[in-house]
Amino acid sequence: MSKDATKEISAPTDAKERSKAIETAMSQIEKAFGKGSIMKLGAESKLDVQVVSTGSLSLDLALGVGGIPRGRITEIYGPESGGKTTLALAIVAQAQKAGGTCAFIDAEHALDPVYARALGVNTDELLVSQPDNGEQALEIMELLVRSGAIDVVVVDSVAALTPRAEIEGDMGDSLPGLQARLMSQALRKLTAILSKTGTAAIFINQVREKIGVMYGNPETTTGGRALKFYASVRLDVRKIGQPTKVGNDAVANTVKIKTVKNKVAAPFKEVELALVYGKGFDQLSDLVGLAADMDIIKKAGSFYSYGDERIGQGKEKTIAYIAERPEMEQEIRDRVMAAIRAGNAGEAPALAPAPAAPEAAEA
């Protein structure tokens, strides 16, 4: 750097000059590294990106743009049996409902078609591959994405992408860094292709414990650091609390999903969803909770009311009441969606007059 250039650098003292300097620097960073590479944490800035809904209104709202972004990589990770594959299949179901074509690369060889159908996936139209090794899985993924005809591609899971050299080697062979190098090379190629084709790529990942960590979080994800960097969205999915029981049988779990990283909107949002065994995420429970938060459904103590109609005592009875009335459910859903689009959850659209309905049981 020349002496003249060094002299030109000086810290602005005036508040307006400092603000202008920050805006200029942010503009230069976005020009060099892309929109969304820097933002103010408290800002509600969003990118105009195409998305695929997750099927959960609360999670779509937490993601800031209405779903997972197309043309980018999303990582879903967490402990075992936390709901990672369920969430990925729910996204596939939503993409198919919108007329999209989806692919599922089952590296774990554990996809349950019966469960997938229960989540709303059209298994007759779902492209499925069960590769023999990690290289084959990522090559298949690249070919699918390059076709430009795939809307969502899921890899389940990164931990199961075993390098060919490891499979062909002897048990106990030390092959450090093979999987990390494989992922790094593949992601460098895939990122640009995804951006051009608009395919949403979902990598499901597992967590491991780092040995000897005394302070901080001992958890880490498999496959090296590359996926952490290339992913535009990272979702931490894990069960919390005790299972919900009916009698002695556990029927559901509460799952907390946190947006650990989000390059298309503000990160660090959290949602809690009910995961019903054999059925997936309870979308109606999610809708009722969100509508109550937005004051579309009024809550007074344990009683819920919609418009002038009291619809139930307690959330479970309210959900059951709405489930029997599809027209009411759709009306509430439309108002919640309108409030989300308006960007103001505190002011919901006015309730349209509805015909009188029989009084809900309060007991």
Curated annotation (Swiss-Prot):
Top-level division of the source organism's lineage: Bacteria
Example GO biological process = double-strand break repair
Q: Which SUPFAM superfamilies match?
A: P-loop containing nucleoside triphosphate hydrolases (SSF52540), RecA protein, C-terminal domain (SSF54752)
| Single GO MF descriptor | ATP binding
Q: Where in the cell is it found?
A: Cytoplasm
What CDD domains does UniProt report for this protein, alphabetically?
RecA (cd00983)
Keyword Calcium in the entry? The reply is: no
Keyword DNA repair tagged? yes
Q: Which keywords are on file for this protein? A: ATP-binding, Cytoplasm, DNA damage, DNA recombination, DNA repair, DNA-binding, Nucleotide-binding, SOS response
Detail which positions bind ATP: G78, P79, E80, S81, G82, G83, K84, T85
A single GO CC term for this protein reads:
cytoplasm
This molecule's function is given as:
Can catalyze the hydrolysis of ATP in the presence of single-stranded DNA, the ATP-dependent uptake of single-stranded DNA by duplex DNA, and the ATP-dependent hybridization of homologous single-stranded DNAs. It interacts with LexA causing its activation and leading to its autocatalytic cleavage. Probably involved in base excision repair. Following severe irradiation (7 kGy of gamma irradiation) genomic DNA is fragmented. DNA is progressively degraded for the first 1.5 hours after IR, in a step promoted by RecA and counterbalanced by DNA Pol I and Pol III, followed by massive DNA synthesis and genome reassembly in the next hour. Optimal priming of DNA synthesis requires both RecA and RadA, Pol III initiates DNA synthesis while both Pol I and Pol III are required for its continuation. In the absence of RecA the majority of the chromosome is still reconstituted, via either single-strand annealing or non-homologous end joining.
Give the record's family classification.
Belongs to the RecA family.
Q: Which PANTHER family match?
A: MITOCHONDRIAL DNA REPAIR PROTEIN RECA HOMOLOG-RELATED (PTHR45900:SF1), RECA (PTHR45900)
- What name appears for this protein in its UniProt entry? Protein RecA
Q: Which organism is it from?
A: Deinococcus radiodurans (strain ATCC 13939 / DSM 20539 / JCM 16871 / CCUG 27074 / LMG 4051 / NBRC 15346 / NCIMB 9279 / VKM B-1422 / R1)
Lineage, uppermost ranks = Bacteria, Thermotogati, Deinococcota, Deinococci, Deinococcales
